[in-house]
Amino acid sequence: MAIILGADAHGNELKEVLKGFLQQEGFDVTDVTDIDKDFIDNTLAVAQAVNDKDTNLGIMVDAYGAGPFMVATKLKGMIAAEVSDERSAYMTRGHNNARMMTMGAEIVGQELAKNIAKGFVTGHYDGGRHQIRVDMLNKMA
């Protein structure tokens, strides 16, 4: 499993914090950020790298998280969540099988962002009754 990271200029500093933290936690991290591009291009780069392998997960950081969320959810096979708390990060993996999350650097601080990222990457899909919802989401895009 690789954790694919991306950011625009507004999220790059927090993305660097997350990269160091996740590497320290022992995760394989790939940074696809092109700082000269906006959130749309960087979100697409993260989502495409996540979709390259079923076990990959993605985290995209910009100022508020909303823009990258909208971009990611337009892509076939991508279930993404905009997250600003630890519990939602963990639960979106467990119940929604989200493979990508977005967050805003102007919304969350560094310590909260680390906890959110850890909750997301350590969460596991529960399957079972949640699969109906995941199937419905996958039919939509």
Swiss-Prot record:
GO MF: galactose-6-phosphate isomerase activity; ribose-5-phosphate isomerase activity
Superkingdom to which the source organism belongs: Bacteria
Enzyme Commission number, as recorded: 5.3.1.26
GO BP field: D-allose catabolic process; galactose catabolic process; lactose catabolic process via tagatose-6-phosphate; pentose-phosphate shunt, non-oxidative branch
SUPFAM superfamilies according to UniProt: Ribose/Galactose isomerase RpiB/AlsB
Subunit structure: Heteromultimeric protein consisting of LacA and LacB.
PANTHER family cross-referenced by the UniProt entry: GALACTOSE-6-PHOSPHATE ISOMERASE SUBUNIT LACA, RIBOSE-5-PHOSPHATE ISOMERASE B
Family assignment from sequence similarity: Belongs to the LacAB/RpiB family.
HAMAP family associated with the record: LacA
Protein name per Swiss-Prot or TrEMBL: Galactose-6-phosphate isomerase subunit LacA
Provenance organism: Streptococcus equi subsp. zooepidemicus (strain H70)
Organism lineage string: Bacteria, Bacillati, Bacillota, Bacilli, Lactobacillales
